A protein has these predicted regions:
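Hydrophobic/aromatic beta-strand elements that line small-molecule binding cavities or substrate pockets
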Residues: 33-35, 89-95, 118-126
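Positively charged n-region of N-terminal signal peptides that target proteins for export
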Residues: 1-4
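Hydrophobic pocket/interface hotspot
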Residues: 44-47, 78, 93, 104, ...
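Hydrophobic ligand-binding cavity/cleft-lining segments
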Residues: 18-69
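Short, highly charged C-terminal tails/helix-capping segments
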Residues: 167-180
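N-terminal signal peptide c-region/cleavage motif recognized by signal peptidases
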Residues: 14-16
Length: 180
């Protein structure tokens, strides 16, 4: 419970993406997040795989999103460099269809330290005025207290990430505008 409360305090939900914990139980959860961007599918895809340009540095181990990278090829790495020869594999690319979908497997961030496994799919669908991007992350396994305790915080991180990707694609800047 304390772990879930800590994660909830760290993560915030962005209004820039439609987010949903589609399913949640002690043994797993599924989150679905969607946005529509003002770009064609290939441009949206190319921006998405440049994760270091739009991911939030607050949700990295290094504190610097520029150290995040995705190798968009089968068995490619969604990795983070920690300097020198240190680093972490957050997810492994398992399916690549440029402009259409990217599938990754593993435990993103702190989930990689738990007894869980996940499958994340990024889908790119042409719609009127641009591209709909959908992040779906299904996680299963074991966590003391139940995985349902962290479904919301994980969903919030992914919603924020997708909102930042939307801003990056639409404006060139992933940072939300600050209104004084």
């Amino acid at each position: 419970m304390r772990k879930a409360a800590l994660l909830a305090g760290i993560f915030c939900l962005s209004p820039l993406a439609v987010a949903e914990v589609a399913e949640s139980s002690a043994n797993g959860f599924t989150t679905v997040n969607t946005v529509v961007v003002e770009a064609d599918r290939m441009a949206a895809w190319q921006a998405a795989v440049q994760v270091g340009r739009w991911w939030n540095s607050a949700h990295t181990m290094s504190g610097d999103a520029a150290r995040m990278a995705i190798e968009p090829r089968v068995q490619g790495c969604f990795c983070e460099s920690l300097g020198d020869e240190a680093g972490v594999v957050h997810l492994t690319v398992t399916s690549v269809m440029p402009g259409t979908s990217l599938r990754l497997s593993g435990g993103l961030g702190p989930l990689g330290l738990m007894g869980v496994y996940g499958n994340m799919t990024w889908d790119f669908e042409e719609v009127e005025g641009g591209t709909r991007i959908r992040f779906k992350y299904a996680v299963g396994g074991h966590m003391d207290g139940g995985l349902d305790q962290i479904a919301g915080p994980v969903d919030a991180v992914l919603a924020e990430a997708l909102g930042r990707l939307r801003l990056y694609i639409d404006t060139g800047n992933p940072e939300p505008a600050v209104i004084d």
